[in-house]
Swiss-Prot record:
This is (7aS)-7a-methyl-1,5-dioxo-2,3,5,6,7,7a-hexahydro-1H-indene-carboxyl-CoA hydrolase. Involved in the final steps of cholesterol and steroid degradation. Catalyzes the hydrolytic ring D opening of (7aS)-7a-methyl-1,5-dioxo-2,3,5,6,7,7a-hexahydro-1H-indene-carboxyl-CoA (HIEC-CoA) to (3E)-2-(2-carboxylatoethyl)-3-methyl-6-oxocyclohex-1-ene-1-carboxyl-CoA (COCHEA-CoA). Belongs to the enoyl-CoA hydratase/isomerase family. Pfam families: ECH_1. Pathway: Steroid metabolism; cholesterol degradation. Keywords: Cholesterol metabolism, Lipid metabolism, Lyase, Steroid metabolism, Sterol metabolism. Its EC number is 4.1.99.-. It catalyses: (7aS)-7a-methyl-1,5-dioxo-2,3,5,6,7,7a-hexahydro-1H-indene-carboxyl-CoA + H2O = (3E)-2-(2-carboxylatoethyl)-3-methyl-6-oxocyclohex-1-ene-1-carboxyl-CoA + H(+).
């Protein structure tokens, strides 16, 4: 359980996330994930990274139960800093990162996938940001890298999911395969990258990031500022408490009137 890394003789490092039952990652886990990805990129024997997960789904975001069990804002700050570190690590990793998405990818998972270089997904995979149903904001920056602008806004405001097939149509998911073929597919793509001259590939990663029209790190931190505002106003706790108690979004009937 936790974050593990393995490197094979072909220059492929596989980073695996395993936090049963749904891969809702605790604060410490986000920092460990960031370290694992960055360490892989620093290793001269690593030519490409595969980021994958065990279990029912790729990622369920932050561990909300951990956050609600902690007094004050310490857990929130840790979770936000951890997410920012992990998202940035995928983006800044010195070699390309291939993500293999199984089942579901929501919340913080979108930040990881949106900052990756190559995305492959199982044919049952869904992607989404339930943030507004949790009284929070964040990762619109990364969702906007997966879908067109107005689709991003619609998905964000409604907290609806989008399928792997839809993302493939938009050009963000490279390949959609049956779940049992997901790991092999990710490895096949990674092997093609690993076979190239790693000196050129490392320069290519840095160059492509350099021409990116959006500063994904600054943009995401701006979003997090509004999450803090919602927390200071008490709105976020209302939503998180109801989610922890019922497993469902806060009812619209609880909206303040007037």
């Amino acid at each position: 359980m936790g974050i593990t890394s393995t490197t094979d003789g072909d220059g492929i490092t596989t980073v695996t996330v395993d936090y049963p039952p749904v891969n809702a990652i605790p604060s410490r886990g986000w920092f460990e994930l960031a370290d694992a990805v960055l360490d892989a990129g620093r290793n001269p024997d690593t030519h490409v990274v595969i980021l994958r997960a065990e279990g029912r789904g790729f990622n369920a975001g932050v561990d909300i139960k951990e956050m609600q069990a902690t007094d004050g804002y310490g857990a929130l700050v840790d979770a936000n800093r951890g997410c920012a570190a992990a998202f940035a690590a995928v983006y800044d990793c010195a070699v390309p990162v291939v993500v293999a998405v199984n089942g579901f990818c929501v919340g913080g998972g979108i930040g990881l996938v949106g900052n990756a270089d190559v995305i492959v997904a199982s044919d049952d995979a869904v992607f989404g940001l339930p943030e507004v149903d949790r009284g929070a904001l964040g990762a619109a920056t990364h969702l906007a890298r997966l879908v067109p602008q107005h689709m991003m806004r619609t998905l964000y405001y409604t907290a609806q999911n989008v399928t792997a097939q839809q993302l493939q149509h938009f050009g963000s998911v490279y390949e959609v395969v049956p779940r049992e073929k997901l790991d092999d597919t990710a490895r096949d793509i990674a092997a093609k990258i690993a076979a190239k001259d790693t000196r050129v590939i490392r320069c290519a990663k840095e160059a492509i990031n350099g021409i990116d029209p959006v500063d994904v790190k600054t943009s995401y931190r701006l979003e997090q500022g509004y999450t803090f505002e919602l927390n200071l106003a008490g709105v976020s706790d209302e939503h998180r408490d109801e989610f922890v108690e019922t497993g469902k979004p806060r009812s619209h009937s609880n909206n303040r009137k007037g």
